Swiss-Prot record:
Disulfide bonds: none
Protein name in the entry: GTPase Der
Example of a GO biological process term: ribosome biogenesis
Native species: Solidesulfovibrio magneticus (strain ATCC 700980 / DSM 13731 / RS-1)
KH-like domain: residues covered: 354-438
Species classification: Bacteria, Pseudomonadati, Thermodesulfobacteriota, Desulfovibrionia, Desulfovibrionales
Residue sites binding GTP 1 per the record: 9-16, 56-60, 119-122
SUPFAM superfamilies on file: P-loop containing nucleoside triphosphate hydrolases
Assigned protein family: Belongs to the TRAFAC class TrmE-Era-EngA-EngB-Septin-like GTPase superfamily. EngA (Der) GTPase family.
Summary of the function given for this chain in its UniProt record: GTPase that plays an essential role in the late steps of ribosome biogenesis.
Keywords: GTP-binding, Nucleotide-binding, Repeat, Ribosome biogenesis
Record text on subunit structure and interactions: Associates with the 50S ribosomal subunit.
PANTHER family: GTPASE DER (PTHR43834:SF6)
Length: 444
């Protein structure tokens, strides 16, 4: 397991900017507003030839009384417990604060290597003036500019010097590979973080009744039965008219981008609110992208039993255009029904990998084509010559026909349903494409 380097500090000192700089990617959301990072983010980074896990934490404010602020501090403290090296980031322009004096003393008591990185120091001539105050702590100190990349080489060297010795390579050690990458989507406060916490078995993500608690896409690894699952907990997707700032707009865009990169998406719906407009749009987006997904109806413990049948009918009605999508009913807070999520996602992904030979495809589909021929369009009927599977994930089938304009959407849906029935594709998305082609020479 690679050593862990945690970045901590008060709000808005540039922790996420430094995180993005060291991981060589714009992975954490950065913004001028304090408190942008709420959960702790993890990503691999290479420091002086050593691979480490870098952890970005939310701003630590021990004086804050709000529940959300306290949970942010708890997440940061959890990162400190597992850290091998701590980067204590401070703002050189703002100077030392009483809050940071308190935090410095707490870090000293940890007994772990701590490096004070004085950020926002632009220009060598200002180093002495902007770092003078921070020497009072008696901790190793460096001046950097995360935004402009200044001092990064010195910082990397200081980190590398404090890393624990690398574990010897064991060629017989079993390799644990990621089975699935899953994106968790849904409206704000639907219970996405609660679902992941229930699967992990700890409060890995901040859970709050304040809508919009999660702003970044946070990767969380779940180990179950010797398998490794990578979950991405995403910002809530809400109506455009309710997105009040640029930060939240970027969070939503990143959530949808995470869904595209995932193997399987999990759409979390709040059972107490039913299927909302944004739930419908999100499902429509995933269906149009032919993305593998399942629906997790959360908070069923808060729905009276007499209303459950109406809820199930409502969800079935909204999924009628993508009836292959599995629906799970659960209560993440109570831990009920959660155990079905990973096996179901794995089953969907297994179907996404299906490969069918061209000969087998054509023999099996010939009966379906003969039984239900394409309808006449302007007095003529499209001729189907042959088909082949062009790709998997999702399974994509290309039909070569005489005239694509004579193939109606309803007939394409019939072809999709026939393929599902013939080859046992029950829960994965299926993509059917018709391509114009001349009649094969051996049929002329």
């Amino acid at each position: 397991m690679p050593p862990i380097v945690a970045i901590v500090g008060r709000p808005n000192v540039g922790k996420s900017t430094l995180f993005n700089r060291l991981t060589r990617g714009r992975r954490a959301i950065t913004h001028d507003l304090p408190g942008v990072t709420r959960d702790r983010l993890e990503a691999p980074a290479e420091i002086e030839g050593r691979f480490v896990t870098l952890v970005d934490t939310g701003g630590m404010d021990y004086e804050a009384e709000e529940s959300l602020a306290r949970q942010i501090v708890e997440q940061a403290e959890a990162a400190l417990v597992t850290a091998d090296v701590v980067l204590f980031l401070v703002d050189g322009k703002a100077g030392r604060t009483a809050l940071e004096d308190d935090l410095a003393e707490r870090l000293r008591r940890l007994g772990k290597p701590v490096i004070v990185a004085v950020n926002k120091v632009d220009g060598l001539e200002r180093v002495a003036a902007m770092t003078a105050d921070f020497h009072a702590w008696g901790l190793p100190l460096l001046a950097i500019s995360a935004a402009h990349g200044q001092g990064m080489a010195e910082l990397a060297e200081a980190i590398a010097e404090r890393l624990p010795e690398a574990e010897p390579y064991d060629p017989d050690a079993p390799l644990v590979q990621t089975v699935l990458r899953l994106a968790v989507l849904g409206r704000p406060n639907a219970g996405k973080s609660s679902l992941i916490n229930a699967l992990v078995g700890e409060s890995r993500l901040i859970v709050s009744d304040i809508a919009g608690t999660t702003r970044d896409a946070v990767d969380v690894v779940v180990h179950q039965k010797g398998k490794r699952y990578l979950f991405v907990d995403t910002a809530g997707v809400r109506k455009r008219t309710r997105i009040t700032d640029g930060l939240e707009r970027y969070s939503v865009a990143k959530a949808l981008s995470s869904a595209k990169r995932a193997d399987v998406a999990v759409v979390v719906i709040d059972a107490t609110g039913g299927v909302g407009v944004q739930d419908k749009r999100l499902i429509s987006f995933l269906d149009s992208e032919r993305k593998a997904f399942l629906v997790a109806v959360n908070k069923t413990d808060l729905v009276p039993q007499k209303d459950m049948l109406a809820l199930q009918k409502d969800i079935a009605r909204e999924l009628r255009m993508c009836s292959h999508v599995p629906v799970l009913y659960m209560s993440a807070a109570k831990g009920k029904g959660v155990a079905k999520v990973l096996p179901q996602a794995e089953a969907i992904w297994a179907e996404c990998q299906i490969r069918i030979g061209t000969g087998e495809l054509n023999r099996a589909m010939r009966a379906s084509l003969d039984k239900h021929q394409p309808p006449l369009v302007n007095g003529r009927r499209a001729k189907f010559y042959y088909l082949t599977q062009a790709a998997d994930a999702p399974p994509t089938f290309v039909f070569f026909v005489s005239d694509t304009e004579r193939v109606r959407d309803s007939y394409i849906k019939y072809l999709e349903n026939s393929l599902r029935k013939l080859f046992g594709i029950a829960t994965a998305p299926v993509k059917v494409v018709c391509r114009a082609s001349h009649k094969p020479k051996d049929e002329r």
